[in-house]
Amino acid sequence: MVTYKDAGVDIYKEDKVIRALASQIKFERTDAIKPADLKGHYAGAIEFGDYYLVLCTDGVGSKMVVAEMANKFDTVPIDMIAMNVNDAICIGAEPVALVDYMAVEDITEDIASQIGKGLNDGIKESNINLIGGETASLPNMIKGVDLAGTVLAVVKKDEIVSGKEVKPGDVIVGLRSSGIHSNGLSLARKVFFDITNLDVNSKLSHGKTVAEELLTPTKIYVKPVLEMIKQVNVKGLAHITGGGFRKLKRLNKDVCYKIDELPEILPIFKEIQNLGNVADQEMFKTFNMGIGFCVIVEKEDAEKIIEIANHHNIPAFVIGKIEDSVEIGGKTKRETVLVEYNNKKMIME
């Protein structure tokens, strides 16, 4: 069975590398400008009067490789923006501005125009301003194009959503993803291009081409989630990206997140699993599996969350609940994420 590690990505090694880097960052300002206590969360924040200024930075990873193969660059900028703004809203912040960074080996005016169009589409959907950026020509360092960005967001101090209020009895509402989003592309490319020898124009069994599926842009959840925060007491917010539902542990680590009512898995994930003979657990550790964002609320508020999502043309479902502990293999587990799928119970650690 093929794994994400076989495709060159070891998420556990990445976790160790990040911890090694973070362990060396010891300096903090000694004046009144203090960072928020959000270590390990989706975004960093620093005090600014009655507000927190929130910063997120991210790129599109190897999705750009597929864009180069298909010579189609107008959707990956949307992915870059989505990866940033979707992280920012996880603490209840409203994204307001973006700066981008593009590193190129060489680039044509046509590719630049496509990227510009995608940037405009992404900032429009996110309701943010693109206020600056940097383009670096690095022919001796990289091949192709790499695109990343940093988003600034703001939130009132007393309106931050940290996830610490998540408690047993709350429910998890999952918002439908548009597809693969921007994570797991290395494994998807290995399955489609190395194992099965398809190309970007090959049709998959459900009718779409490989390029159409892999270049579908990441869903931007800014507008519906900000509306949810205004209308409902939202306890926790989680952008489901690399690592899948493990991301829920960024919220309250003292509870169990039980995912046991998943909707139908999207066709792209079935294709990857079937063609690559990928195990269920590996799929859920690598991909969003059709749920791109989670909203945790009290049970009586779930219907309103679903209503708001549907108003923004996003299907939403109650996919699980918060519990003190879960049972698996005759053992009691605490402080974990349990996914039940295909008559299996899987711990996401």
Curated annotation (Swiss-Prot):
A cellular component term, taken from the record's GO annotations: cytosol
Q: Which organism is it from?
A: Methanococcus maripaludis (strain C6 / ATCC BAA-1332)
Query: What superkingdom does the record give?
Result: Archaea
User: Which molecular-function annotation in GO is an example for this chain?
Assistant: phosphoribosylformylglycinamidine cyclo-ligase activity
Its recorded reaction(s) are: 2-formamido-N(1)-(5-O-phospho-beta-D-ribosyl)acetamidine + ATP = 5-amino-1-(5-phospho-beta-D-ribosyl)imidazole + ADP + phosphate + H(+)
Pathway info: Purine metabolism; IMP biosynthesis via de novo pathway; 5-amino-1-(5-phospho-D-ribosyl)imidazole from N(2)-formyl-N(1)-(5-phospho-D-ribosyl)glycinamide: step 2/2
Chief location: cytoplasm
Tell me which UniProt keywords the record has, alphabetically. ATP-binding, Cytoplasm, Ligase, Nucleotide-binding, Purine biosynthesis
Could you confirm whether the keyword Electron transport appears in this record?
A: no
Q: What is the enzyme's class at the highest EC level?
A: ligase
The cellular location(s) given in this protein's UniProt record come to: Cytoplasm
Q: Which family does it belong to?
A: Belongs to the AIR synthase family.
Keyword ATP-binding (UniProt): yes
Write the protein's name.
Answer: Phosphoribosylformylglycinamidine cyclo-ligase
